[in-house]
Amino acid sequence: MDDAEILVDVQVVPQYAAVVDATLVERAVAQTLRTDDVAGPVEISILITDDADVHRLNQTYRGVDAPTDVLSFAEDDDHSFVRPPDAPRYLGDIAISWDRVVAQAAEYGHSRERELAFLVVHGVLHLLGYDHERGPVDEADMRAREEAILGALGLSREG
């Protein structure tokens, strides 16, 4: 898929705008879609925010009263909203907590860039139907895909 066929709407809350690399987010999305041979054009929205916002979203949409690192909301095909025939296929929304990016990068001993890219890749894979919570085989498949995509981006665990 050509990068021109990938529309990524990256929104970063103001307090993190100076530290979040939106280009890295776009690259991680594109690499994930190319690796999985997704046909374009497609569109994804990504919000980079704080623990409080992600906590609220987690509570509202999943019934979980806790913050988390990444949430994915795949576009359902109920067709309640009619899109023009030439519009990109909307894959869904991802919300990422920058607070978790910082904490987990420190905990795992790698860069914030790698952690951010990991969470983007993880979220996009969920939008594509992958689910590590289905069992050990699915978890191993998803982890292998994540590592391959991060490797293609040049983001090792040590980076």
Swiss-Prot record:
Cellular compartments annotated: Cytoplasm
GO function terms (MF aspect): metalloendopeptidase activity; RNA endonuclease activity; zinc ion binding
InterPro entries membership: MetalPrtase_cat_dom_sf_prd (IPR023091), YbeY (IPR002036), YbeY_CS (IPR020549)
Positions bound to Zn(2+): 122, 126, 132
PANTHER family (alphabetical): ENDORIBONUCLEASE YBEY, CHLOROPLASTIC
Keywords assigned by UniProt, alphabetized: Cytoplasm, Endonuclease, Hydrolase, Metal-binding, Nuclease, Ribosome biogenesis, rRNA processing, Zinc
Named cofactor requirement(s): Zn(2+)
Family the UniProt entry places it in: Belongs to the endoribonuclease YbeY family.
Protein name: Endoribonuclease YbeY
Gene Ontology terms: cellular component: cytoplasm
Enzyme Commission designation: 3.1.-.-
BP terms from Gene Ontology: rRNA processing
Cofactor note: Binds 1 zinc ion.
The protein's enzyme class: hydrolase
Task of the protein: Single strand-specific metallo-endoribonuclease involved in late-stage 70S ribosome quality control and in maturation of the 3' terminus of the 16S rRNA.
